[in-house]
């Protein structure tokens, strides 16, 4: 319905955008006639290869932050669209998407497959998603390829999966799975992707088909799924790695390609809460618990436990002892999982930590309640969470304390290259002192404030 068409600096503000059969707002790319749906029309190159071709061609034909992107999409009500609320491919770089209410996207399932979500963007380089409410969508936010320098901060995600009244049985399970979404899907990206001070209240929080993600000061009440999978390309007998580009720091020039090794993720000062699944979702979980596929492991257990088999930095670093170079002994260490860092996290209601996290706070005895309460002036969090969360137990996180994203060798910093100190919370209130409390709120009293 609204599209800048490969231009720069549009502002879409205070609009009601609804009932598009496809997408509400498009931040897409220009037409490349030689690449127009080439996978379908020419057939001989897989879509992942034609995607790489399109990216490289665009970088030779004017795709840079001086000419494209830097849009502002804010204070909009975007709802009841068939495919996406906001969509973008290359054309949304360096944009700010904030204070939008995005809901009821793809809930009718009249369109299915890829490119579905409240927001779906390829190459969200240096894009900031701030203080949006994304809810009641098949999927909340889908960051596909090159989420480099991307920041997701101070957002509220809820009810982004199957509808409340869904039913599942052996006859309809394939149709049901096509609508099994999550709050965020990060796919074939090397980061740095920064996710901080958000509330994830859907039953599935993050689909981790990527690496280089840092999660800091979030409330996470859903599971991590697709850990270590979802990055190959559907071959049957032969390898089909998706070679993925990474870029110059805060720019679009392609610096190299690599396969996804998984790992290189960082979890600091988050609160994990295991929610009780809806009865029908529990039934679905039981039906699929022993049937993972190449794209999803159907995990519904909350916490960092899926990363238990990943090395710590010390374990990974030890592989490189001694001589490394030509004629060194053959080794897999350049292609194995990258390390995972985890510290300062709180695990409640049976949420589980990675086996290698040192001194996590785990409370399995008490029962935390989480619910959204809709009042006349907006949404509030109804919870007893801070009856059990310890106060001021861990240090302040900053750009300097987070290891850089491995493949692009880029720090978790602002788009202008300045460092970030995570001393502001979901509401923008200051976290005082050298020790801070885990989660998106600086203190318990803030749970009484309006979320959105």
Where are these regions (language model features)?
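Glycine- and acidic/polar-rich repeat regions and solenoidal domains
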Residues: 1-5, 9, 18-395
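Short, surface-exposed, low-complexity cationic segments
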Residues: 434-452
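C-terminal accessory segments
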Residues: 259, 368-440
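Surface-exposed loop/turn and secondary-structure junction residues enriched for glycine/proline
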Residues: 5, 89, 122, 415, ...
């Amino acid at each position: 319905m609204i599209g800048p068409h490969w231009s720069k600096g549009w502002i879409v503000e205070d609009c009601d955008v609804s009932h598009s059969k496809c997408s509400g707002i498009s931040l897409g790319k220009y037409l490349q006639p030689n690449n127009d749906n080439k996978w379908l029309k020419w057939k001989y190159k897989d879509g992942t290869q034609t995607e790489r071709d399109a990216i490289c061609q665009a970088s030779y034909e004017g795709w840079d932050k001086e000419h494209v992107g830097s849009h502002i999409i804010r204070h909009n009500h975007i709802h009841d669209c068939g495919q996406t609320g906001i969509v973008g491919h290359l054309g949304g770089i360096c944009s700010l998407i904030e204070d939008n209410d995005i809901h009821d996207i793809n809930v009718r399932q009249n369109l299915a497959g890829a490119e579905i979500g409240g927001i779906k963007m390829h190459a969200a380089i240096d894009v900031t998603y701030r203080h949006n409410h994304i809810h009641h969508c098949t999927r909340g936010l889908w960051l596909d390829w090159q989420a480099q320098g991307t920041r997701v901060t101070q957002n509220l995600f809820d009810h982004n999966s199957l509808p409340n009244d869904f039913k599942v049985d052996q006859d309809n399970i394939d149709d049901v799975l096509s609508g099994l979404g999550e709050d965020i899907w990060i796919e074939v990206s090397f980061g740095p992707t920064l996710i901080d001070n958000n509330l994830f209240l859907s039953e599935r929080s993050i689909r981790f088909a990527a690496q280089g993600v840092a999660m800091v000061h979030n409330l996470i009440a859903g599971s991590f799924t697709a850990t270590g999978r979802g990055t190959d390309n559907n071959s049957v007998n032969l390898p089909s790695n998706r070679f993925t580009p990474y870029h110059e720091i805060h720019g679009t020039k392609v610096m190299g390609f690599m396969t996804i090794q998984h790992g290189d993720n960082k979890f600091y000062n988050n609160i994990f809460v295991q929610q009780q699944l809806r009865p029908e979702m529990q039934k679905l979980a039981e039906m699929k618990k022993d049937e993972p596929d190449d794209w999803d492991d159907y995990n519904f257990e909350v916490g960092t436990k899926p990363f238990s088999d990943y090395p710590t930095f010390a374990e990974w670093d030890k592989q490189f002892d001694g001589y490394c170079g030509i004629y060194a002994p053959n080794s897999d260490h350049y292609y194995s999982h990258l390390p995972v860092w985890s510290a300062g996290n709180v695990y409640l209601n049976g949420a589980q930590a990675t086996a290698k996290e040192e001194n996590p706070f785990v409370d399995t005895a008490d029962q935390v309640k989480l619910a959204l309460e809709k009042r006349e002036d907006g949404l509030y969090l109804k919870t007893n969470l801070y009856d059990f969360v310890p106060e001021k137990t861990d240090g302040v996180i900053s750009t300097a304390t987070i290891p850089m994203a491995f493949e692009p060798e880029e720090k978790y910093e602002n788009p202008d290259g300045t460092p970030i100190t995570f001393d502001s919370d979901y509401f923008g209130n200051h976290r005082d002192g050298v020790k801070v409390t885990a989660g998106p709120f600086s203190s318990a009293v803030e749970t009484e404030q309006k979320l959105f």
